[in-house]
Amino acid sequence: MNYARFITATSAARKPSTIRVMTEILSKAPKSVISLATGAPNPNTFPFKTAVITIENGKPIQFNEQMMKRALQYSQSAGIPELLSWLKQLQVKLHNPPTIHYAPTQGQMDLCVTCGSQEGLCKVFEMIVNPGDNILVNEPIYSGTIHALQPLGCNMINVSSDEHGIIPDSLREILSKWKPEDSKNPKKNSPKFLYTVPNGNNPSGNSLTAERKREIYELARKYDFLIIEDDPYYFMQFNKPWAPTFLSMDEDGRVIRADSFSKVLSSGLRIGFITGPKPLIERIVLHIQVSTMHPSTFAQLLVSQLLYQWGEEGFLGHVDRVIDFYRKQRDALMAAADKWLSGLAEWHVPTAGMFLWVKIKGIHDVRKLIEEKAFKKEIFMLPGCGFYTDSSAPCPYFRASFSSASPEQMDLAFQRLAQLIKESL
């Protein structure tokens, strides 16, 4: 892979931060070293001394004074070593990427910890998107991605999708406007990457099948573009066996994968991780060095302590319990939809994630119905227009989340919505 052609001029100009490099060196230095170089504050001046955090299905996590001093201090930009090590082992267990044993320059698998996967994705976009670049997305698309990409001035080309995710034939038709060799000619402006949420897509709830992923990956090889696999709902797939990931079939080192603990451990701790070819991960870390500097050391240590206590089996056991909860929540929302919205709307049952994507029949644009009328009836959902690059266009869809409401609340919400729809027709 020629990674240089994907890197923006701004990203290519980034150099390692001297102070951040020093932090890395000092973390590996023997304790006998007398450091007069660090700009880190003296931890003895910090007011927080100890903490004990109780854990469901586990022993309390204790931060003694020494651990607390480390937790409150600066740390390495790529992530603390023990968490990086655990996560790399997890990725090998779950995905077994072909690139594990590649040479570093040839796309060897690497990863870094980020302040949630959203930060990681923003760093990826900053690294590879130039104004005018053509990139491939599938609408409806996560609104956070739209708002991250639009200011960068790229051209977002929509690839059609259905309840099984991106339609390969649609992607093939779009790509037919270029020749495979056009990727070597910057003037041809062939697509630089495909962005996709393969499981429980937010907002549509659809999930890519293994067969479609293989077709898409082969097209990526043919036309030489990257795949950004944004998979925050990977640990919320309701049906087993789980479909193989793009990372698991990445023979070329062209997949950048974003994972998150936000949905299964904590959304507020802001711990995510980006996995991909080493030359690109190293460049993402350079972006981190001059922005957030590193994810919260405290949050990383807390998550790391939990994961080492649980082990992989314990963590995946917790994931299964989370899945059981959300499956029941989904089923409750489906029951409410079947009861009240049949004949008034249409939808597909989500196989992952926490969202139901609903199209109201007979109403060209549901924005006013959802934003104003429904809110007056004390039900709150999101109109679908916010998940399209042209948010001003009429849209008959809305997104309903089944993460927090009780089954009784879901039933009441859809009962009220059904009445509003009937009044609006």
Swiss-Prot record:
Names of the cofactor(s): pyridoxal 5'-phosphate
Main location (coarse class): mitochondrion
Enzyme class (EC, first level): transferase
Binding site for substrate: 20, 74, 142, 202, 399
InterPro entries reported in the protein's UniProt record: Aminotransferase_I/II_large (IPR004839), Class-I_PLP-dep_aminotransf (IPR050859), PyrdxlP-dep_Trfase (IPR015424), PyrdxlP-dep_Trfase_major (IPR015421)
Transit pept. (range): 1-29
Location of N6-(pyridoxal phosphate)lysine modifications: 263
Biased amino acid composition, Polar residues: 198-208
One Pfam family linked to the record: Aminotran_1_2
Stretches for region Disordered: 178-208
Complexes and interactors: Homodimer.
Cited function: Transaminase with broad substrate specificity. Has transaminase activity towards aminoadipate, kynurenine, methionine and glutamate. Shows activity also towards tryptophan, aspartate and hydroxykynurenine. Accepts a variety of oxo-acids as amino-group acceptors, with a preference for 2-oxoglutarate, 2-oxocaproic acid, phenylpyruvate and alpha-oxo-gamma-methiol butyric acid. Can also use glyoxylate as amino-group acceptor (in vitro).
Protein name: Kynurenine/alpha-aminoadipate aminotransferase, mitochondrial
Species name: Bos taurus
